[in-house]
Amino acid sequence: MTPHEPASIFKRIAALFYDCLLLIAVFFVITAVAVRVNGGEAIESPLYLMALIPVAWIFFAWFWINGGQTLGMRAWKIKLVNESGDAISVRSSVTRFAVGLVFFPFVLLPALFDNDKRGLHDKLAGTKILRLKQY
């Protein structure tokens, strides 16, 4: 196996599941602080939920830009790179996240029919997820 083989859809979904568990923990901490600031009252505004979207992007983008691997991706030994095999840009991270968010859960459907197993968000962002060599 070379380090340039595309990662399987199963590994991508498993890594996303791990990352979502971590992101939920981050949301819990932010919400606990926000409720405290709000005098102990629940925050019922949909604007609060919308404010969590940039938090999610920062969570994913930081890992994607700095090393190409979220914690879930590290666990499943997969890595996000641009089409040249280098680290992705901030612009690519915005595109990838936004398309993934808007078209979830259908974003991976193109990967079922693509030789490089690239989802819609990867195609539009110019990124790909590789399976890393295991030692």
Label each region the model flagged.
Residues M1-Y135:
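Membrane-interfacial and juxtamembrane segments of integral membrane proteins
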